Amino acid sequence: MLTITSYFGFLLAALTITSALFIGLSKIRLI
């Protein structure tokens, strides 16, 4: 149970970081 929770937490964090970087690059490219 703990392993699954940690896995999903890591996956969510990775997804958040990826989208944040993508949005940042998009804004820079937009400017």
Swiss-Prot record:
The chain crosses the membrane at residues 4-24. GO terms for molecular function: electron transporter, transferring electrons within cytochrome b6/f complex of photosystem II activity. Signal peptide: none annotated. Keywords: Chloroplast, Electron transport, Membrane, Photosynthesis, Plastid, Thylakoid, Transmembrane, Transmembrane helix, Transport. It is a single-pass membrane protein. Belongs to the PetL family. This is Cytochrome b6-f complex subunit 6. The 4 large subunits of the cytochrome b6-f complex are cytochrome b6, subunit IV (17 kDa polypeptide, PetD), cytochrome f and the Rieske protein, while the 4 small subunits are PetG, PetL, PetM and PetN. The complex functions as a dimer. It comes from the Eukaryota. SUPFAM superfamilies: PetL subunit of the cytochrome b6f complex. InterPro entries: Cyt_b6/f_cplx_su6. The keyword Coiled coil does not apply. Disruption phenotype: Cells have no visible phenotype or growth retardation effect under light intensities ranging from 4 to 400 umol quanta/m2/s. Component of the cytochrome b6-f complex, which mediates electron transfer between photosystem II (PSII) and photosystem I (PSI), cyclic electron flow around PSI, and state transitions. PetL is important for photoautotrophic growth as well as for electron transfer efficiency and stability of the cytochrome b6-f complex. Seems not to be required for photosynthesis. The keyword 4Fe-4S does not apply. Disulfide bonds: none annotated. One of its GO terms (cellular component) is chloroplast thylakoid membrane. Its main location: plastid. One of its GO terms (biological process) is photosynthesis. It is found in: Plastid, Chloroplast thylakoid membrane.
